[in-house]
């Protein structure tokens, strides 16, 4: 610390950067500093801070002071805000729509509204009194510290860029931890970790802490996350069954009565495969190949399934591979498809033509008119054609010599 006593800034109207960190000040008059861009006043004894004239302020670091409240309504250009280690019990952030870094750890916050902060990339709200943390609008979030609160739920399904999470020291049950793991998006590619783990869910010094020892970390690790706590998956009477994305068909889960089990997240493309079922509950797999395809291989956690039912004990990932159905036969008289040694055309005025290679890859998918020729190299293909006017669809297997 470098004590300097009082600071007189009355004659500094053009000041853009002010660093008074660890100077021992208890008051700071910024009335005339209307051009200030960066303010570093951390590690002092400030109990109040008037920022009403600092419209252009972009960075504020006022951590480790004695602030019990702060008015940020004039600081509409703030991008970086650090108020850690104060005594704030509430804060209004609604005007700070450009914030990318927000650090509010070690305060007395019992709630926080982040709905107007879509640009946040780094969020530190650790060691507060939060029972709920709503993050659905923070789609740019990459780093989250929410450890040391009273959270019982944490949904991160809208955070595809998240790469560091510290959530230990909360009150999540084993089921809640599983829900958190399931909500995580796949770990971003190309990220180099600076720490041993990307997800800290427990801590030896935290009491109480999350029951991660009885949760199932596979739900997270299979997506590339490195979790600091092993779990035995024994603490929850429900398990997650994930149906991996498929091509040329789909898999649905159903209970014994044939009722389709709906995904937990029905509107998120990244999470459509997640289903929650009771442990030891027998479930059926409803297999629906696309027209012209059949199921080739069905696995659960890499092991081939011989039937169409299973009884999961912990997280289970279902993979299905569909192949061309060799039993598909061309119609006796085609009204839509014409074949020559050079390729395929349509007999309809307009048809949507889709051509698949023998390994199931889409080779061509375009509307064509009568007489237009789609040339094909030598090989075997599956062709579907839908006549736009008649609404008829034909499927035919084609061999180009």
Predicted regions, residues:
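Conserved hydrophobic beta-strand positions in leucine-rich repeat
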Residues: 16-20, 37-41, 58-62, 79-83, ...
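Surface-exposed interfaces of beta-sheet-rich extracellular modules
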Residues: 280-307
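Canonical leucine-rich repeat
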Residues: 6-7, 28-30, 49-51, 70, ...
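Short, surface-exposed loop/turn motifs with a glycine/proline- and acidic-biased composition
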Residues: 361-390
């Amino acid at each position: 610390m470098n004590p300097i006593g009082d600071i007189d800034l009355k004659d500094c109207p053009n000041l853009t950067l002010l660093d008074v960190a660890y100077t021992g000040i208890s008051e700071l008059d910024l009335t005339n500093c209307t051009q200030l861009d960066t303010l570093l006043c951390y590690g002092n004894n400030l109990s109040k801070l008037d920022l009403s004239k600092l419209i252009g302020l972009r960075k504020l670091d006022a951590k480790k002071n004695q602030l019990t409240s702060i008015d940020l309504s004039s600081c509409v250009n703030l991008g970086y805000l650090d108020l850690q280690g104060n005594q704030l019990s509430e804060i209004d952030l609604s005007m700070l729509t450009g914030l990318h870094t927000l650090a509010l750890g070690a305060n007395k916050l019992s709630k926080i509204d982040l709905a107007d902060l879509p640009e946040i990339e780094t969020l530190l709200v650790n060691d507060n009194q939060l029972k709920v943390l709503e993050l659905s609008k923070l789609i740019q979030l990459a780093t989250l510290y929410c450890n040391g609160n009273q959270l019982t739920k944490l949904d991160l399904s809208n955070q595809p860029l998240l790469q560091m999470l510290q959530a230990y020291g909360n009150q999540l049950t084993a089921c809640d931890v599983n829900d958190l793991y399931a909500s995580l998006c796949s770990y971003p590619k190309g990220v180099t970790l600076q720490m041993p783990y990307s997800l800290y869910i427990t801590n030896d010094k935290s009491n109480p802490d999350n029951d991660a020892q009885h949760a199932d970390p596979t739900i997270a690790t299979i997506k590339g996350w490195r979790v600091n706590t092993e779990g035995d998956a024994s603490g929850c009477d429900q398990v997650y069954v994930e149906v991996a994305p498929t091509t040329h068909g789909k898999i649905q889960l159903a209970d014994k009565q044939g009722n389709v089990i709906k995904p937990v997240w029905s509107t998120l493309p990244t999470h459509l495969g997640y289903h929650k079922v009771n442990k030891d509950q027998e479930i059926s797999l409803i297999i629906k190949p696309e027209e012209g395809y059949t199921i080739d291989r069905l696995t659960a956690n890499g092991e081939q399934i011989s039937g169409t039912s299973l009884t999961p004990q912990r997280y289970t990932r279902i993979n299905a591979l569909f192949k061309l159905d060799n039993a598909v036969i061309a119609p006796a008289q085609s009204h839509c498809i014409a074949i020559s040694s050079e390729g395929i055309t349509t007999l309809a005025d307009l048809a949507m033509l889709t051509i698949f290679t023998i390994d199931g890859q889409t080779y061509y998918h375009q509307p064509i008119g009568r007489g237009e020729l789609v040339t094909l190299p030598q090989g075997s293909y599956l062709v579907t054609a839908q006549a736009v006017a008649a609404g008829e669809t034909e499927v035919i297997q084609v061999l180009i010599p």
